Amino acid sequence: MRTSQYLLSTLKETPADAEVISHQLMLRAGMIRKLASGLYTWLPTGLRVLKKVENIVREEMNNAGAIEVSMPVVQPADLWQESGRWEQYGPELLRFVDRGERPFVLGPTHEEVITDLVRNELSSYKQLPLNFFQIQTKFRDEVRPRFGVMRSREFLMKDAYSFHTSQESLQETYDAMYAAYSRIFSRMGLDFRAVQADTGSIGGNASHEFQVLAQSGEDDIVFSDVSDYAANIELAEAIAPQTPRAAATQEMTLVDTPNAKTIAELVEQFNLPIEKTVKTLLVKAVKDSKSPLVALLVRGDHELNEVKAEKLPHVASPLTFATEEEIRAVINAGPGSLGPVNMPIPVIIDRTVAAMSDFAAGANIDGKHYFGINWDRDVATPVVADIRNVVAGDPSPDGQGTLLIKRGIEVGHIFQLGTKYSEALKASVQGEDGRNQILTMGCYGIGVTRVVAAAIEQNFDERGIVWPDAIAPFQVAILPMNMHKSFRVQELAEKLYSELRAQGIEVLMDDRKERPGVMFADMELIGIPHTIVIGDRNLDNDDIEYKYRRSGEKSLIKTGDIVDYLVKAIKG
């Protein structure tokens, strides 16, 4: 490709509304342009990267035995009503009616459509297992699209759905998809972790997220510094302290604390170690409970894990925190003065709290706290559960090493759905025993457009994008200095351009009448891995300058050797 016949569209300045580095660089490198909120046009450079990501995904899905299909973006509402998600999904589901007043949606996902297809096409266990996939546009009406294509309303996604007659069969396909995803992200040159995850609104049993490590990530991911243990922070287990609870050394004392309504204020005003404080959070109880509220206690420096808390048998789902009015109606004290002593509602404490002694907590009286509280002496030990977020340095739950926490960008997610959708849509086949059998499902997604942004978040420097070789828009940039004035520069550039293309190498030759500084800046901004610079001065010695984008290393290569050098560098 020649720049004179190409839409380069690079920008010198960073657009003001671009918050994260991937959004900034995708705009500056001429990869995307905004059409409306959360909607983007992919320009040639961006589309080349997107297609490379898509091709790697497709190759590995095919290698794993999945079958490609293509389903409509527009879906009839009756399928969503049949599955129960018409009411559940919320405003992210873009709904509309056609000219016949029939309701439809723009598909944010395709569980209903694929299950409808399978229930009409499959009849026997002999046809299973099957795993269908597509790479197709999705639409979610995000309340606040942001970060460019990282959280857009329209995006390209690979979604796959597998169907089985046994949990064992589902597990085999799930393991195959886990391995395929690992190969996909490894081939793309990404630093990622596969982490245990919550199944969320999609439902089901086992679930893993594939997270690309990046400072701009929206998720906290947890992994051991020694073993393969990794989990989303929502699921990472905080194991109980290994040391026994220390003996009491203080008497419980009622202390006036009129200006201490938060843990931070209590610690500052009374010079308490925060590790000796407990905070009490009140949430709604399940409907058939004798009490309307449940008290959850975590150490002062720890955070409640809402996903873990919501799964407790006494706690209502979705997790709902009590209002001050609701708290006062039950406790007769405000939220800044709550604690376990004389608490009239069920109490659940975190494992770390259960190991505490001589601690401070609210007295359930406005403006007062108890100091020196000890379990079993001052208050009976309540139900103990893991209800906090882990912190860096906690022991790994597998007993190997300690936990690290980093930010991650979710680029893939795999689920064992079980029978949630097949039961709702009555998708069954005749089993081996001749009886009807409801199908067991798995689903497996990759955000193809999000992968492009995540790769940039992990691969950039002050000059622009530093693409991993496998997904770079071009493999080689040829920069002929003053080629419109120097015949030998032009002749060699054209010769190398033809020879490299004949080797199957993707080349961008900058044949613009531009200053060298502009040419260098654009190629580095775009992030092409290999650059060769052809100039009269080096040609006097039969040399060409070669530069590797990732390391910045430069070297002089003889003109007769440069093609073989590049072929070896690119193809190995």
From Swiss-Prot:
It is found in: Cytoplasm. One of its GO terms (cellular component) is cytosol. SUPFAM superfamilies: Class II aaRS ABD-related (SSF52954), Class II aaRS and biotin synthetases (SSF55681), YbaK/ProRS associated domain (SSF55826). CDD domains: ProRS-INS, ProRS_anticodon_short, ProRS_core_prok. GO terms for molecular function: aminoacyl-tRNA deacylase activity; ATP binding; proline-tRNA ligase activity. InterPro entries: aa-tRNA-synt_IIb, aa-tRNA-synth_II, aa-tRNA-synth_II/BPL/LPL, Anticodon-bd, Anticodon-bd_dom_sf, Pro-tRNA-ligase_IIa, Pro-tRNA-synth_IIa_bac-type, Pro-tRNA-Synthase_IIa_type1. Its EC number is 6.1.1.15. It is an enzyme of class 6 (ligase). It comes from the Bacteria. The keyword Oxidoreductase does not apply. The keyword Protein biosynthesis applies. Belongs to the class-II aminoacyl-tRNA synthetase family. ProS type 1 subfamily. Catalyzes the attachment of proline to tRNA(Pro) in a two-step reaction: proline is first activated by ATP to form Pro-AMP and then transferred to the acceptor end of tRNA(Pro). As ProRS can inadvertently accommodate and process non-cognate amino acids such as alanine and cysteine, to avoid such errors it has two additional distinct editing activities against alanine. One activity is designated as 'pretransfer' editing and involves the tRNA(Pro)-independent hydrolysis of activated Ala-AMP. NCBIfam families: PRK09194.1, proS_fam_II. PANTHER family: MITOCHONDRIAL RIBOSOME PROTEIN L39/PROLYL-TRNA LIGASE FAMILY MEMBER, PROLINE--TRNA LIGASE. This is Proline--tRNA ligase. It comes from Salmonella typhimurium (strain LT2 / SGSC1412 / ATCC 700720).
